[in-house]
Amino acid sequence: MVTETPLEKPLDIGEIPLPAMEKRATEVAILLKTLAHPARLMLACTLAQGEFSVGELEAKLDIRQPTLSQQLGVLREAGIVDTRREAKQIFYRLAEDKAARLIEALYAIFCAPEENL
């Protein structure tokens, strides 16, 4: 039998001022919209594990280089990933802690191996 851990009770909506809630909702909607593509979601999940070169990402995810570059560009433009150049190689890593935490939560919910009890 799988026992689910109860979620922490979120703050009462009345505790967050409406303008702050609207701002947060907009930020989250933009982040979710950016991640709402299978290739970008796979990239973000992989980058949650650490920094990878374009070649490593291409091999690991079996995404062709033109598609990979396009999707990494979208993530970079949204501020979700940062880059580092070393000679001719470009390395990518998650830039935003909130994105990393969201990816970790999505992984735990949808991708983690189920326990056999």
From Swiss-Prot:
Q: Which domain of life is it from?
A: Bacteria
For this chain, one GO molecular function annotation is:
DNA binding
All residue ranges annotated as the HTH arsR-type domain in the record:
20-114
Q: Which Gene3D superfamilies match?
A: Winged helix-like DNA-binding domain superfamily/Winged helix DNA-binding domain (1.10.10.10)
State the UniProt keywords alphabetically: DNA-binding, Repressor, Transcription, Transcription regulation
Q: What happens when the gene is disrupted?
A: Cells show altered biofilm formation; on glass surfaces and on tobacco root surfaces, it exhibits a greater biofilm mass than the wild-type.
Please name the PROSITE patterns in this protein's record.
HTH_ARSR_2 (PS50987)
Where in the chain is the DNA-binding region found?
A: 54-77
Q: Which PANTHER family match?
A: ARSENICAL RESISTANCE OPERON REPRESSOR ARSR-RELATED (PTHR43132:SF2)
Its job: Represses an operon that comprises at least itself and blh. Binds to a palindromic AT-rich sequence spanning the -10 region of the blh promoter and blocks transcription of the operon.
Entry protein name? Biofilm growth-associated repressor
Species in which this protein is naturally found: Agrobacterium fabrum (strain C58 / ATCC 33970)
